[in-house]
Amino acid sequence: MSKPIVATTSLAGCFGCHMSLLDIDERILDLIELVDFNKSPIDDIKNFTQQCDIGLIEGGCCLDENVHVLEDFRKHCKILVSVGECAIMGGLPAMRNGIPIRECLEEAYLKGPTVRNSNEEKIMPNDEELPIMLDRVYPCHEVVKIDYFLPGCPPRADLIWNALVALVKNEEMDLPYEVFKFD
């Protein structure tokens, strides 16, 4: 019997959720026995090579490129899981949502204390190669259908492990309080 296929990606986030996944420590060897990875920074596969059973999404959508990646994951994954606060609610990147995008860019490139004296030409990046910023940061479920949510910033490794094993084995998730609590 073939192993379930898992894909992962990081959108507008810090990669902390992937680090938490790697924090399952030696259980990563057990995970490799349970699943194969496809399109993931974990195995450096950059494009889907087949349909996947489970997709783990970290980060929200703040660029048009994030939306395209998320839609591609929805198309290629039977089950899609939002992992972490950025994917679920927009997280820290969503702090810009109450500020018009132009003001955010001006603060970052023209007025901020770290750039005020270093950008005397008042240049703001504007190149067709750069991804287009969205008007706000969108949580994943506002863009595509999400099947499961794993909260935390980042979620604990035990939470990710328990949820992933339950999904792979087609079992009900047993997620006791301890896997949500972070000391």
List the predicted regions and their residue ranges.
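Iron-sulfur-associated redox domains of electron-transfer enzymes in respiratory
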Residues: M1-D183
